[in-house]
A protein has these predicted regions:
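Rossmann-like S-adenosyl-L-methionine
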Residues: 1-128
Length: 128
């Protein structure tokens, strides 16, 4: 509620419907959600339509972020990125592409699935 504007992109249509319903039920009017593939939606045109953001929270699928999405993020020079990942290997690959523009300032692994090999890893990146 305190943010000026929140834009959500989700690949699962049902999750977008649920998010829109939740926002409506909670009288939150500063959000907009779009369903689709991030690499197709997150473009210069998308950014010009929605404006430049001061924070990106990304939680890509196991394959990680598409290189075109990373290129758009680098062009934006968003001050902070919170990168949540269920695959530390692809997260590491993506962070390698971001390292010239962003510093890793915090890392927090989270064991959401005890007694399995799965771990969520959260990284805070800040613009250099």
């Amino acid at each position: 509620k305190d943010a000026k504007k929140v834009i959500g992109i989700e690949s699962v249509e049902e999750a977008v419907i649920s998010a829109k319903n939740s926002a409506k039920e909670n009288n939150i009017t500063n959000v907009d959600f779009e369903a689709g593939d991030m690499k197709k939606l997150f473009s210069s045109e998308f950014i010009s339509r929605h404006g430049i953001c001061d924070l990106i929270i990304t939680d890509p699928p196991r394959d990680g972020m598409h290189k075109d999405v990373i290129k758009e993020i680098i062009k934006l020079k968003t001050p902070k990125i919170v990168y949540v990942s269920c695959n530390p290997s692809t997260q590491c690959r993506d962070l390698e592409l971001l390292k010239d523009t962003y510093d890793i300032t915090k890392v927090q692994p989270v064991d959401m699935f005890p007694h399995t090999d799965h771990v969520e890893n959260i990284v805070l990146l800040e613009l250099k």
